[in-house]
Amino acid sequence: MSHISNAEWEVMRVAWASEEVTSSYIIDVLQQNHDWSDSTIKTLITRLVDKELLASRREGRRFWYRALISEEMGQWTCVSDTFAKICVVNHKTLIEKLVADTPMSLADIDDLEKLLNIKKFGAVDKVVCQCLPGQCSCQHH
């Protein structure tokens, strides 16, 4: 997936929320919370079409858009790209912070506990830094 800006992400969220949307609907939704002009939003839509993240079709004078990737795939790509930039030794601390800061139901917590119990079977003795020397401060080089 191509890198998308925060503003483009907002457009994708509108597209993910419905099977297919018009440009005017995207504009209406985003202008509720942003001071963006119609042309700015149309430019964002065009960029996403160019990046092959949105498909477009014309019906009369109206343009319809639909997401070409799932919301789950978009979210996973965003998170995995971020984690790829961070020393693997620090991932656990970040995950702990995410868990601490994320509202969860008891069922969500049960699911995480089950996942961690399964993860124990393939656990390594020590997580080894994969960074090039001089790229991080984890002191594992």
Label the predicted regions:
Residues 70-96:
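Conserved segment of winged-helix/HTH DNA-binding domains
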Residues 52:
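Glycine-centered, phosphate/nucleic-acid-interacting loop/turn motifs that mediate DNA/RNA or nucleotide
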Residues 21-30:
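Short acidic, hydrophobic short linear motifs in intrinsically disordered regions
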Residues 3-7, 59-79:
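Short, cationic-aromatic polyanion-contact patches
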Residues 56:
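Short beta-strand "wing" residues that participate in macromolecule-binding interfaces
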Residues 6-14, 25:
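Pre-recognition alpha-helix immediately N-terminal to the DNA-recognition helix
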